[in-house]
Amino acid sequence: ELKGRVIAVTGSVGKTGTKEALRLVLSRQGKTHAPVASYNNHWGVPLTLCRTPSDVAYGVYEIGMNSPGEIVPLARMVRPQVAIVTTIQPVHLAAFASLEGIAEEKAGVYWELEKGGTAIVNADIPQSELLRDIAKSGPAGRIITFGESPDADVKLISCALKPDMSVV
């Protein structure tokens, strides 16, 4: 069993970039483990969990999906204290009737938070309120929103994308 903080990242896009940013930042705070690639499916998540040293301070796990019913079982394996949904995009519409259906599936990660955990929600997407409502109805003790929206708890003030780095 992991003694460190466990973070789950899901979303239609941005999972790997978010995972890598978290790995970079958290590794300066303590021993951090994250998958070396996009191991975010029913094979990759258990493999990553098995490869995680028990003494890490932080474990960062990507959770992906292709069809309904995939997020909750993977999140249940991970048992995060922090869960992030990066964004919702029309990349899974072949398997879902709407963007709201995709959002509901992705929000399944919030249902598997440890009691009192933190749900992190993108404030800049149309499904933000739906994601917040789902997070409120689960075990989350805290919900943090992020983005450029004036209502976001954590606001992006400026961003410069350069060939070898991003400055925020």
Model-based region annotation:
Residues 1-123, 129-140:
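Phosphate-binding loop of NTP-binding sites
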